[in-house]
A protein has these predicted regions:
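Class I S-adenosyl-L-methionine
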Residues: 1-36, 40, 173, 180, ...
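Conserved Class I S-adenosyl-L-methionine-dependent methyltransferase catalytic core
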Residues: 35-121
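Conserved class I S-adenosyl-L-methionine
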Residues: 123-132
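Conserved SAM-binding motif I beta-strand of class I
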Residues: 147-152
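Conserved SAM-binding loop
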Residues: 161-162
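Conserved hydrophobic residues forming the short capping helix/wall of the S-adenosyl-L-methionine
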Residues: 165
Length: 402
């Protein structure tokens, strides 16, 4: 695992110009982020039709095959960094209607994670970190019949989760608390198997720190939202990552999260329309008022998009308190600029996509190596298929026996 990380770290360091940029802001520069370093890559990007851009975005494997023509070592790195696929585990013996009230894809994630955790169970009790209503904990309690402590910040979720667990007669106890408060450390005991599904940023980091300090029997977690941290730059956990030349910004930590599989064609079109409107509004501000930097606009209800670009500009200028002469604005012109900028953003982001998973593996390996350094036997694998969620990596660790 150490040699894997070192190899990956070297590759990402050498290829920084091709992934360390914000595609959203790339349209503001006439030059591509990598300048004149790779004219063949630039020529290929500029030759793509809009349909081809969409097709490559929907098919990461096909995109990787193309990108390896420009980065010959990319294919070998991806092969070396391949993690174990989801294991073939029989269905769990769960009662009927156990998934009541849980959206289908979310339930698939929870059930898949539950299977992996049961297969790797090492402790005598579970600690479900950042539990929400305890959906994952219900599976663990039902199948293992071991007690589950579900730790959650939001009191209403604790109350609802406890009621449902009691109705199912499950050995679950909800604890409301702040993960960053010192007393939350007391939840970790040597016989505990600490688990977290998609715990965000600093939350999964805090769990690992507490769990290793307490010397818990086992730790299993699937990280998410790496950018949700108090620090401006990524704080590496393992000694090898701390020595890396890569000092990732909070914004760069968003990159692995930009691949999504949720939503259908309607959701995709809504996203495109909203981005075109935002970029068109930005162009209007730039040309009419001389704004030199992008103005962030609040989220908008998707139903409002159907009112058209002019209505969006009126709404956005009101939200931001900006005085605009909308009567004289050529909305068709600025909407077209937004359209062009959106597809330039999508075009440039294709190159980043070839590195996105590798950056996520870099982040996950840092945590895995940290656990190794703390005396745990560690494995990294996928707990479900990408189509269920791209955030499908799980780290399983158990204390090394003396």
């Amino acid at each position: 695992m150490h040699s894997q990380f070192t190899l990956l770290d070297s590759f990402l360091t050498q290829t920084q110009p091709f992934w360390r940029y914000e595609a959203f802001h790339a349209y503001r520069s006439e030059a591509l982020p990598w300048g004149v370093q790779h004219p063949g890559l630039t020529q290929w990007l500029n030759s793509l039709s809009l349909q081809e851009i969409e097709e490559y975005k929907a098919d990461p494997e096909r995109l990787t095959q193309i990108l390896t023509q420009f980065f010959p070592s990319l294919a070998e790195i991806k092969r070396t960094m391949t993690v174990a696929k989801p294991p073939c585990i029989p269905s769990l013996p769960l009662p009927k209607h156990f998934d009541k009230g849980i959206p289908g894809r979310k339930w698939q994630q929870i059930e898949a994670m539950g299977k992996v955790l049961i297969a790797h169970n090492q402790g005598k009790q579970w600690l479900e970190w950042c539990s929400g209503k305890g959906y994952l904990g219900r599976i663990l309690a039902s199948v293992s019949q071991q007690p589950v402590v579900s730790f959650e910040y939001q009191a209403e979720l604790c109350h609802s989760g406890q009621q449902e667990a009691d109705a199912l007669k499950l050995p679950m106890h909800f604890v409301q608390g702040d993960a960053f408060a010192n007393d939350s450390f007391n939840l970790f005991e040597p016989v505990t198997h600490a688990v977290a599904l998609h715990a965000c940023g600093d939350l999964h980091v805090r769990m690992l720190q507490y769990a290793t300090s307490a010397g818990v029997e086992a730790i299993s977690f699937s990280p998410c939202c790496y950018h949700l941290t108090h620090d401006e730059h990524y704080q590496a956990m393992s000694s090898v990552a701390q020595n890396s030349a890569l000092k990732l910004t909070r914004q760069e930590l968003r990159l692995p999260l930009q691949e999504t599989v949720t939503g259908g064609e309607r959701v995709k079109r809504h996203r495109q329309q909203e981005m075109i409107y935002r970029l068109g509004f930005d162009a209007l501000l730039s040309q009419q008022l001389g704004f030199s930097s992008y103005v962030s606009v609040p989220s908008i209800q998707k139903s409002q998009l159907s009112l058209g670009f002019a209505a969006f500009c009126a709404w956005a200028s009101k939200e931001k308190g900006i005085s605009l002469d909308l009567e004289c604005a050529d909305f068709a012109y600025f909407e077209h600029i937004g359209f062009q900028r959106f597809w330039q953003m999508e075009r440039v982001s294709l190159v980043q996509e070839g590195f996105r998973r590798l950056l996520e593996i870099w982040l996950v390996l840092d945590k895995a190596l940290y656990l190794q350094e703390k005396g745990y036997h560690v494995s990294v694998s996928e707990f479900c298929e990408r189509q269920v969620t791209p955030r499908n990596l799980v780290v399983n660790a158990h204390r090394t026996k003396d």
